[in-house]
Amino acid sequence: AIARALLLEPELLICDEAVSSLDAATRTQILDLLLRVVKEKKIACLFISHDMALIRRISHRTGVLYKGTLAECAKTRDLCRDPWHPYTKVLLDSVMPPDLLKARKQKVPVVHEGKSEGGCPYFGSCGYKMEMCKDAAPEMYDFEGRAVSCHLYSKQQRAGRNPNYK
C-alpha cells in the first residue's frame, strides 16, 4: 500500500498505523526505507499511530488527540519530556521508558468519573479539573509554537497555577 501511494508522487503521505501489524525486523526495514524516500523526494508525511516509541523515532512534531479533539501539539522531543495537557501526561506515563519518566517533573493524578457532558472532553478523567472545565470546552492556547487545549493555560489560570504543574 505504501509503494502504491508513493507511485502517485504525493506532496503529503498519510500513514495510518502503516507498520503496526509488521514484525519488528520488517517494521524497522520498512520505516527506514519510508523515511529515506520521504526525505529524498521531499514529501511531507503524517503518521497516525498509538505507538509512542515509533512517534519518538520518526516525528519532528506530534499532535495528541483525545476523543477526536486536539489536546496538545508540540515538537516531539519537548512533548515527550514535558507534556502539558493532563491527558498527554497520562498517555506518556503509560508507555514511556523509565529514563524519560525520571526526567519528568511529576506524574498527573488520574480520576475516573465517567464521561464528560459538555465542557472539556477530558473533564471526567482529569486530576486537575476546575469548575470552568465542566461548563466550557477549552480554547487552543498557543505558546511560541506549542499549543495546548486546557483551561490550565488560560490567562486567568496561568498567574495562579500550581508551580509544580507546567
Predicted segment positions?
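Generic detector of short, locally flexible boundary/turn motifs and exposed helical patches
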Residues: 12, 27-29, 113-119
